Amino acid sequence: MTVSTAQMRFWSPEVRELEPYVPGEQPKIQNLLKLNTNENPYPPSPKVVEAVQEVLHEQADVLRLYPDPDATVLKQAIAKQQNIDVSQVFVGNGSDEVLAHIFKAFFLQDGPILYPDITYSFYPVYSQFFGTKTKEIPLNENFEIDVRDYTQPNGGVIITNPNAPTSIALSLAEIEQVLQANPDRVVVIDEAYVDFGAESAVSLINRYENLVVCQTTSKSRSLAGLRVGFAIAQSHLIAALEAVKNSFNSYPIDRFAIAAAVASFEDQAYFEEQCQKVITSREKLVRDLTELGFNVLPSKANFIFATHSQHDAGQLAQKLREQGIIVRYFNKPRINQFLRITVGTNEQNARLVQTLKQDIL
């Protein structure tokens, strides 16, 4: 939408300066292979479908009532699955909303918050939106986070682990180094992709009062369409998030989303099975692309980050699109020769590989 300067006179001055986040493309094209937004290729647990149907058909009358503002049953399900106390759980309308509350609750400090120069692109958006001071820390030449860079004075730290879009993960020992170096600042570990092979920092919660772990049901639990995210931390940090939430939107999660998420957390066997399928498919996709001449960064996510020395990444993305396959291309410094490719089913990955081999490379 184009808005004229004259029309912008109604806008707040700060809004005129915003550079909003650009979501991944959601095209409505038949027979399209969509490997650009890291959605799970498999459906949610059948128990999720049953739970949603129960709300719709057996509890329809309650839809006239507001949902539980605390989403208590969901917090209980998360606490049980993570083996923590319910007072250590915060829930929100997707992890993006949870992250927004985190920025408001903890990062309006005198010093700058630290995050990598190549990371989730919502961080600079939130920083601008809330007026947070920031300092971007360059990844090393191998696109890895050097935790020693996060020991300098700051107003807080946020790290995606595994990182996005690079897919590379830190160890728990490295995360502990960051926590120990910043005892008076909040350290946020954004674990949107942690269930695909990385180590979760949730196990460190009771040892570090400055740690917040943020997760989502969108990736590993196939619930991107329902928007349920959560944070785990000691109760004094959760209290700050609740204060922000109840100053913004007291009812962030609807009844369908609560029921679906609870059912997902209660079906651990299905969750683990689907995660392993993605991991196995990822490993084969890496092998296949490597044979085609791609250099693929070591991935612990449900996507890979790959470059080809003989082919321009932007042109590859365009040629794939012409063949009905969409991947994510970032026209940004340092990564403009990489493609981020979501791991699909074995059949979807095979279509990608065959298209590259027969029609493009």
UniProtKB/Swiss-Prot annotation:
One of the GO BP terms on file: L-histidine biosynthetic process
Cross-referenced Gene3D superfamilies: Aspartate Aminotransferase, domain 1, Type I PLP-dependent aspartate aminotransferase-like (Major domain)
GO MF term set: histidinol-phosphate transaminase activity; pyridoxal phosphate binding
UniProtKB keywords: Amino-acid biosynthesis, Aminotransferase, Histidine biosynthesis, Pyridoxal phosphate, Transferase
EC class (word): transferase
Protein's name according to its UniProt entry: Histidinol-phosphate aminotransferase
Cofactors: pyridoxal 5'-phosphate
Coiled-coil annotated residue ranges, if any: none
InterPro entries, per the entry: Aminotransferase_I/II_large, HisP_aminotrans, HistidinolP_aminotransfase, PyrdxlP-dep_Trfase, PyrdxlP-dep_Trfase_major, PyrdxlP-dep_Trfase_small
Modified residues (N6-(pyridoxal phosphate)lysine): K219
NCBIfam families found in the cross-reference section: hisC
